[in-house]
């Protein structure tokens, strides 16, 4: 069972039928940025009633309070004067709209990887400072940590037409899985594709 970035499979399995190799080569992954902001307190979010904010036009299109999960010796924040984590998500895109999707992802990927940490920090400062009231939020006082996680090849995105279905066909003793073969970027799809791939194995 090959459960990897599906576009790489033709480079590993070099005797694939041309149609299948071409279909796998058309699968894409969008770039993705997950920024984690550690706050010393989150009273500004509480006072403004913000749990999640959609921010079109900003680098980070989604901002939300982290999920209230306690595990082991860790317990999630119990009140707005305690530390918490805020997640900021960005799905970068090309500055030139209307281009083919693959080109937009490529341009966004290069721009994302070429951006220094200081620029991300300044964007988060501006974003949160513009969204939250200065009565309860001061970036320098309230932000304890900032982590920017960049994935050049983040979420699976379907290629054109039937390329996903064609690409995931068994080849000899090889079956193909991973979320790429469902063109959905989540664990459930990955497990479903893994199950499918195992059932396709010839005994």
Q: What are these language model-derived features?
A:
Residues 1-7, 119-124:
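A short, hydrophobic secondary-structure junction motif
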Residues 2-55:
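Glycine-rich loop(s) and the adjacent beta-strand/alpha-helix scaffold that form part
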Residues 38, 44-203:
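Conserved flavin/dinucleotide-binding core of flavoenzymes
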């Amino acid at each position: 069972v090959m459960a990897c970035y599906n576009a790489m499979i033709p480079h590993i399995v070099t005797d694939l039928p041309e149609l299948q190799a071409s279909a796998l080569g058309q699968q894409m992954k969008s770039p993705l940025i997950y920024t984690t902001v550690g706050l010393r307190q989150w009273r500004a979010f509480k006072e403004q009633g913000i749990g999640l904010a959609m921010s079109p036009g900003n680098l980070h299109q989604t901002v939300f309070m982290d999920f209230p999960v306690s595990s082991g010796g860790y317990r999630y924040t119990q009140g707005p004067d305690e530390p918490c984590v805020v997640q900021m998500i960005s799905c970068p895109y090309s500055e030139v709209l209307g281009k083919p999707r693959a080109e937009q992802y490529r341009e966004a990927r290069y721009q994302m990887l070429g951006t220094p940490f200081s620029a991300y920090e300044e964007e988060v400062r501006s974003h949160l400072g513009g969204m939250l009231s200065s009565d309860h939020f001061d970036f320098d006082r309230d932000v304890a940590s900032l982590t920017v996680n960049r994935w050049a090849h983040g979420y699976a995105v379907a290629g054109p037409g039937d390329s996903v279905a064609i690409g995931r066909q068994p080849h000899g003793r090889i079956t193909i899985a991973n979320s790429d073969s469902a063109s959905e970027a989540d664990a459930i799809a990955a497990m479903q594709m893994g199950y499918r791939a195992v059932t396709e194995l010839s005994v």
